[in-house]
A protein has these predicted regions:
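Solvent-exposed loop/turn segments at secondary-structure junctions
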Residues: 121-124, 157-161, 170-174, 184-188, ...
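Fungal secretory targeting signals
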Residues: 1-20
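Active-site-adjacent substrate-binding region
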Residues: 269-375
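N-terminal hydrophobic or amphipathic helices/low-complexity stretches enriched
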Residues: 69-126
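A non-catalytic alpha/beta surface segment that caps or lines the substrate-entry region
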Residues: 111-169
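Primarily auto-inhibitory N-terminal propeptides
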Residues: 18-84
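Second-shell loop/turn segments in exported
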Residues: 95-104, 118-128, 150-154, 192-203, ...
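Acidic/histidine-rich catalytic neighborhood of metal-dependent amide-processing enzymes
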Residues: 160-163, 194-287, 291, 316
């Protein structure tokens, strides 16, 4: 979550203003296999090869890959890309939330994560990454089977792995939607396409937190007053590809979004460190973070603290933030106490510091976020 010296040099080079990219150039260079990367806020995007893109990832540089979304983003009015700070009421649905979180099961989450981490990897361009997205869609469709007012579908991309979206219509279908997100993909930075990448914590934990939250809400017969969605994104590790595609689509189609919360890594804290919920400090909405502080205090056993800034495009919440949506991201630990083995074959549940009891608290947060903001 920190930029290296090499990353700072890359960002400096990107801060050169240029005219908008013409469609002919965009399509021609994309057809050659080049990728258009947005490396910094208010900087012009730059073209990189896939190998150069991978080197940026290895250097710890975060970015949006906007190759597929650049044209759509140019059509969205700039006035729509920033919203005033939002305010959210204090938690008031304790009876409902407490009843539902009592049904959350770490055994269910562990079973789901076992399946997900058994894929060789969930890289967005690999066949097993595509298989993982199929498994997620099949799983959530099974959960909502026979339930009215709830649907599940794929959001297709130009690469092999689709994103998955579950929608609760809500009683007032015209109201703004509340969204919870996680990313389904994983990566081994040494060998992305074929390397072993169980991605147990990054982001298997967030993925199964949301699957279990969905199961608990459906089993409880919860019907939101306003629309509620669960998103599992493809291609986060490749430059927030899936979330940016979905967010751009929603912005371009005028879909109103009340709030977005990302769960990206919820299962680890460094042995000997204080167990906390760490709220990301940048590219978030202060009002939503204040609401989450109350949620954590009301519904979990953990103290809440602020993390240090994670930087530009560090996870899927950034995709929504740039379209003016109130966003937040509760994280597993303060940076430095988080999982050091991500993006490798060692991101498994067997490492010291991984805790299902810890991850369960984030599923509680997800239930509370969903119920409190849609009731």
């Amino acid at each position: 979550m920190r930029l290296s010296l090499a990353g700072l040099v890359v960002l400096a080079l990107a801060l050169v203003r240029a005219a908008p990219i013409e469609p002919t150039e965009l399509h021609s260079k994309a057809a050659q296999g080049l990728r258009l990367l947005d490396l910094a806020e208010d900087a012009e995007p730059v073209w990189k090869t896939e190998d150069e893109k991978l080197e940026l990832m290895r250097a710890g540089v975060h970015f949006f890959d906007v190759t597929e979304t650049y044209e759509i983003e140019q059509q969205i009015p700039k006035s729509a890309l920033r919203a005033p700070a939002a305010t959210f009421p204090a938690p008031s649905q304790q009876t409902t939330v407490t009843r539902i979180i009592a049904t959350l099961s770490t055994a269910n989450m562990q079973a789901s994560l076992t399946t997900l981490s058994n894929f060789n990897n969930r890289y967005y361009r690999s066949s097993t990454g595509a298989d993982a997205s199929t498994w997620i869609l099949t799983t959530v469709r099974s959960i909502i089977s026979g339930k009215s007012g709830i649907s599940a579908s794929n959001f297709a991309h130009s690469w092999g792995q689709s994103s998955t979206i579950v929608k609760f219509a809500g009683r007032d279908t015209s109201a703004p939607v509340t969204i919870l997100g996680a990313h389904m993909d994983s990566i081994n930075l040494s060998s992305p396409t074929s390397g072993r990448a169980p991605g147990a914590d990054d982001d298997g934990t967030g993925t199964v937190n949301l699957i279990e939250t969905l199961r608990a809400l459906v089993a409880a017969g919860f019907t939101p007053a306003t629309p509620l969605e669960f998103h599992w994104y493809s291609g986060e590790e490749g430059g927030l590809l899936g979330s940016n595609a979905v967010a751009a689509n929603y912005a371009n189609n005028g879909v109103r979004v009340k709030a977005f919360m990302e769960l990206d890594m919820t299962g680890y804290f460094r042995p000997g460190s204080t167990e906390v919920v760490a709220l990301e400090a940048d590219y978030i909405d202060t009002g939503l973070n204040n609401f989450l502080k109350q949620v954590v205090t009301t519904y979990t056993r953990l103290p809440v603290t602020m993390d240090t800034p994670c930087g530009y495009a560090c996870s899927d919440h950034a995709s929504w933030f740039k379209y003016g949506i109130p966003t937040s991201m509760p994280f597993e630990a303060v940076t430095g106490n988080d999982n050091p083995r991500i993006h490798s074959s060692s991101d498994t549940i067997s490492q010291s510091g991984f805790s299902w009891a810890h991850s369960l608290e984030f599923a509680k947060i997800a239930v509370a976020f969903a119920v409190e903001l849609t009731s």
